[in-house]
């Protein structure tokens, strides 16, 4: 399992070259980039193949591969509104384009429902991804659907059902260790989802009470028990990157990056 980090940890004031340099110097082995709004190191819907070639050269310079393409504009692929749904499909297609040109092997997808009822939205999402399957499989890029706090995936069973109904080896789960830790054990989700898990976001969580929680950095105090989490990942045969995901601080992000990379090293040894 390689140490990776999402570029959001660096901050939009830094260009791609500075971002790659800081991530490499901190001890990470890969970086996850983002399809996002405009920013110094954001990929956008307007990013071209020529733009991506420049990033490829930076990646080679620092010997830091791109592990995946995340996004903050995932859209509502489960929406009954055709225009809203098509916008979400376009995001997935753009992520696949970006990943292919950057040599990344996976993208992160965040299905949403908009104002569509939950059950109907899941079936619409499944049909949308079935339609996308030929495009996905043609690129050879893995698509991992992530459970975020938008009310779409409420349990590992919801994720498993959706992935299984889509029925492609290239569509699975992008598992976020912290996003399910408010009410359940991350290791239970890992065990249930098994080989459906294609990629992992490694994030900390601190559940102080039923109504009080926080997302501390990996090197800060949290309530996730990393021993069973790592045991569960090994049991299902996961060998992909562990991608840290956290926001950039004010000022230089180097200290947080270094401490986070060190924290992943310690977690890897558990």
Q: PLM ranges: what are they?
A:
Residues 3-7, 31-33, 66-71, 107-109, ...:
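Hydrophobic faces of well-ordered beta-strands that scaffold small-molecule active sites
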């Amino acid at each position: 399992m390689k140490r990776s980090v999402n570029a959001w940890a660096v901050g939009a004031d830094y260009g791609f070259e500075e971002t790659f340099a800081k991530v490499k110097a901190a001890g990470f082995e890969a970086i996850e980039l983002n399809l996002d709004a405009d920013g110094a190191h954001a990929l956008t819907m307007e990013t071209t193949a020529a733009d991506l070639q420049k990033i490829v050269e930076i990646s080679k310079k620092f010997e830091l591969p791109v592990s995946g393409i995340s996004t903050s504009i995932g859209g509502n692929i489960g929406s009954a509104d055709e225009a809203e749904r098509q916008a979400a499909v376009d995001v997935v297609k753009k992520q696949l384009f970006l990943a292919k040109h950057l040599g990344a092997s996976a993208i992160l997808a965040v299905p949403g429902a908009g104002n569509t009822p939950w059950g109907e939205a899941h079936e619409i999402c499944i049909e949308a991804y079935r339609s996308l399957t030929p495009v996905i499989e043609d690129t050879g890029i893995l698509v991992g659907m992530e459970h975020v706090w938008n009310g779409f995936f409420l349990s590992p069973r919801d994720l498993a059902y959706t992935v299984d109904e889509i029925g492609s080896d290239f569509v699975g789960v992008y598992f976020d260790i912290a996003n399910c830790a408010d009410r359940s054990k991350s290791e239970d989700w890992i065990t249930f989802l098994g080989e459906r898990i294609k990629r992992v976001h490694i994030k900390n969580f601190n559940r102080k009470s039923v109504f009080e929680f926080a997302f501390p950095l990996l090197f800060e105090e949290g309530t996730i028990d990393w021993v069973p989490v790592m045991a569960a990942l090994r049991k299902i045969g996961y060998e992909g990157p562990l991608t840290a995901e956290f926001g950039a601080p004010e000022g230089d992000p180097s200290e947080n990056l270094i401490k986070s990379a060190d924290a992943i090293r310690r977690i890897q040894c558990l």
